[in-house]
């Protein structure tokens, strides 16, 4: 039962972008709807759990949420350019690399020889995995597809910065997940409004995309519930499995066309990135 709870965040987070794409709307309507859904769920959680809230916790949570909005908006923009099945493995790999480097440099993780070996192996696996999942179709290789891939990577670098700050700022100020959840959601909505208002995102798609926001917040809730039961390392490792759902979902549910060569590359790449996530989880322990 505990392992099942720990897998739920991966299932929920891995399906968010699939819901976004399936429900429709551009990246701006999608991200705004998602943030509103997260806020609705987080308000409910706040009244049930009643975690500690102070001006410091509120400020940290809002900053974290603002940067989450930056990360999510740009991830959705990348999906529009290169698709879910390419975006999600690359995005996950970039996030793992950036948070790992930050963890080593600032929080002095990987303190033992074993953790250093596992960490370095994980980074190598991630880099190889990203290369394999981003293979182009040789028959359809045009200047436009090359240009889209380049733009997608640049957009994902900005997205990774957003996700990095979203994760790190909460840890740096030692704010618990339960306490951060509500102010984070406020920051997410504020960030969503700031990033999207020029693009006139207010339409019916915003309402439809509230559903992925509810799913995101539910994933967070199950992460907080599972961590004390299975440990941070295990819950972190299992949460990386979401890449399998989002990538395969992009191909199977959204009908993204892939050649045999690309499918093999994506399959091996996913295995490498998930393995890297497990290694990093062990290295953190």
Residue ranges and their predicted role:
Residues 1-285:
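Polytopic alpha-helical membrane proteins, predominantly small-molecule transporters/carriers
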């Amino acid at each position: 039962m505990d392992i099942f709870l720990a897998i739920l965040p991966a299932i929920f987070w891995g399906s968010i972008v699939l819901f976004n794409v399936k429900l429709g709307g551009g990246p701006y309507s999608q991200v705004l709807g998602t943030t509103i859904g997260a806020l609705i769920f987080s308000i409910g959680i706040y009244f049930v759990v009643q975690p500690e809230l102070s001006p410091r916790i509120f400020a940290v949570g809002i900053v974290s949420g603002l940067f989450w909005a930056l990360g999510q908006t740009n991830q959705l923009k990348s999906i529009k350019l290169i698709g879910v099945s390419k975006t999600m493995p690359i995005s996950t790999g970039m996030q793992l690399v950036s948070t790992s480097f930050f963890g080593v440099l600032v929080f002095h993780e990987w303190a033992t020889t074993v953790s250093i070996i596992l960490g370095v192996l994980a980074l190598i696996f991630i880099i190889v995995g990203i290369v394999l999942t981003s293979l182009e179709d040789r028959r359809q290789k045009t200047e436009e597809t090359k240009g889209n891939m380049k733009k997608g990577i640049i957009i994902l670098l900005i997205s990774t910065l957003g996700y990095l700050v979203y994760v790190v700022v909460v840890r740096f100020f030692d704010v618990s997940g339960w306490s951060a959840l509500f102010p984070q959601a406020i920051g997410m909505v504020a960030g969503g409004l700031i990033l999207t208002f020029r693009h006139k995102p207010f339409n019916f798609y915003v309402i439809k995309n509230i559903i992925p926001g509810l799913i995101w917040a539910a994933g967070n809730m199950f992460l907080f519930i599972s961590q004390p039961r299975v440990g941070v390392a295990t819950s972190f490792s299992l949460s990386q499995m979401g890449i399998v759902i989002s990538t395969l979902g992009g191909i199977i549910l959204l009908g993204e066309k892939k050649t045999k060569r690309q499918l093999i590359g994506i399959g091996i790449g996913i295995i490498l990135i998930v393995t890297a996530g497990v290694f990093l989880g062990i290295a953190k322990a």
